């Protein structure tokens, strides 16, 4: 059975969407959506000049290993807030502690560049389940940040609209049909990213819609709005997806191999 690392929210599955209690919410429909522009960047220790605070429809995605940091370890540690240090201290083992610190250091480094301020001065507001909000100190523009983990990877998404990330890793030792497992994991990643973006609002999603062959698709959830889902190539058996509450027009990608196929 596939699992998502570090998922602290309620447990949902596509099968649960057929429950009678959700019938009154109406059916979800798949709507047409255009393929966004993708701009790939190598993982680097400075941001390109053409990368700015994301506007509506723009998305920044970072993928890196826990060992990668844009600055020396000691410098990055000095950026962490008191509450972040306490959270790191309370992690149950060294590996999870290191992963948490790496993700927070990189988030502060990225947002510091986007806001043109010192990383230690970035005011991050935790919204739970690895979701963070930050507001520009001068013009008040806000961004949403989501962090997901899977295998050796840390994935960070940044947008001006609500978003949700999901990374699905098959359970160690599980034996399944390869094709079926891949498709199930992809549906699971899409569904979990929707759940994360919606903050676990229960919605009626047909499992067949989650099996769309397109790597970018949009779901009309009625009163909950239209949400745009993008598959992320991760390699191996890992599957990932990101959901955004706005049509995707431009996606900046950091850390994916050159030539990676999106959508």
Which residues fall in each region the model found?
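Core catalytic alpha/beta fold that binds nucleotide/phospho-ligands
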Residues: 2-263
């Amino acid at each position: 059975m596939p699992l998502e690392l570090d998922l602290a929210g309620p447990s949902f599955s596509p099968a649960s969407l057929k429950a009678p209690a959700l019938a009154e919410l109406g059916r979800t429909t798949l709507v047409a959506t255009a393929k966004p522009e993708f701009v790939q960047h190598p993982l680097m220790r400075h941001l390109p000049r053409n990368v700015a605070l994301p506007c509506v429809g723009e998305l920044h995605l970072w993928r890196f290993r826990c060992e990668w940091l844009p600055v020396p370890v000691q410098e990055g540690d000095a950026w962490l807030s008191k509450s972040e240090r306490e959270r790191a201290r309370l992690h149950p083992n060294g590996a999870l502690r290191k992963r948490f610190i790496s993700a927070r250091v990189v988030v502060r480094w990225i947002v510091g560049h986007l806001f043109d301020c010192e990383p230690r001065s970035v005011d991050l507001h935790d919204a739970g389940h690895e979701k963070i909000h930050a507001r520009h100190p001068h013009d008040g523009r806000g961004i949403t940040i989501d962090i997901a983990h899977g295998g050796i990877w840390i994935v960070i998404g940044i947008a001006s609209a609500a978003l949700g990330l999901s990374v699905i890793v098959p359970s160690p030792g599980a034996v399944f049909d390869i094709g079926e497992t891949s498709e199930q994991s992809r549906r699971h990643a899409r569904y979990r990213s929707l759940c994360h973006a919606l903050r676990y609002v229960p919605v009626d999603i047909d499992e067949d819609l989650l099996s769309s062959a397109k790597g970018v698709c949009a779901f009309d959830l009625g009163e909950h709005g239209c949400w745009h889902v993008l598959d992320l190539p991760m390699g191996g058996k890992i599957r990932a997806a990101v959901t955004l509450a706005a049509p995707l027009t431009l996606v900046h990608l950091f850390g994916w191999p050159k030539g990676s196929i999106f959508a």
